[in-house]
C-alpha cells in the first residue's frame, strides 16, 4: 500500500479508537472535542488538529484552558513559531531569556512567539482563560525543550 493508503489506515485507527476524528476520501478531517493530553509544559490541552489526530505535518492547533493560578513550565520550541489567540479571559505571558518580560493578553488578542524564545503563560487572574494555540509543526511537543533553569522565576513570582 502506498503512502496515502498508509495514512488512511492510521486515520481509521484513530477513528476506531477515539471516535473524535473523521476523514473523507479527499483527506479533509474533522476533530471533535473530547481528547485531552498533558504536555511537557505541565498543562492539559484539549487536542485539536495535529499529526496525532489528522496526520498534519506542518501545523497544529490545540485549545489550552487554564484555570486561575495555573502556569506552564518555562520552555522553548526549537525552530518552531507559535501564534496564540485568547478566546476567553486573560493571561500573562512571561517571556525572554530570563522570563524578564510580561505581556498581558486579553480576550480577542493574539500573540506571536518567535522560535527559540523562552516563555510560560501564567493565569494570574481569578477567572479561567482559554487559548487557541497554533504551532508551525505537526505537534506542539515537537522540539519542545524545557528550560528548567528558569523554573525558579515563576515559583518565586509574587513573593
Q: Model-derived features: where do they sit?
A:
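Conserved short histidine dyad/triad with adjacent acidic residue
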Residues: 49, 62-78
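A short beta-strand-loop-beta hairpin characteristic of the jelly-roll/cupin
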Residues: 80-107, 117
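A generic "binding-loop/recognition-motif" signal
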Residues: 68-70, 79, 98, 117-118, ...
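Ligand-binding loop in jelly-roll beta-barrel domains
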Residues: 106-107, 115-141
Amino acid at each position: 500500500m502506498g503512502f496515502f493508503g498508509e495514512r488512511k489506515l492510521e486515520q481509521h485507527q484513530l477513528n476506531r479508537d477515539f471516535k473524535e476524528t473523521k476523514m473523507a476520501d479527499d483527506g479533509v478531517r474533522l476533530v471533535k472535542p473530547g481528547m485531552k493530553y498533558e504536555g511537557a509544559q505541565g498543562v492539559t490541552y484539549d487536542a485539536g488538529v495535529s499529526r496525532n489526530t489528522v496526520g498534519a505535518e506542518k501545523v497544529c492547533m490545540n485549545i489550552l484552558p487554564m484555570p486561575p493560578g495555573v502556569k506552564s513550565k518555562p520552555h522553548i520550541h526549537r525552530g518552531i513559531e507559535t501564534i496564540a489567540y485568547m478566546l476567553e479571559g486573560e493571561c500573562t505571558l512571561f517571556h525572554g531569556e530570563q522570563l524578564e518580560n510580561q505581556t498581558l493578553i486579553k480576550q480577542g488578542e493574539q500573540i506571536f512567539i518567535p522560535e527559540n524564545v523562552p516563555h510560560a503563560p501564567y493565569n494570574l487572574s481569578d477567572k479561567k482563560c482559554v487559548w487557541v494555540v497554533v504551532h508551525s509543526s505537526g505537534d506542539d511537543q515537537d522540539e519542545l525543550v524545557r528550560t528548567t533553569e528558569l523554573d525558579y522565576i515563576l515559583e518565586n513570582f509574587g513573593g
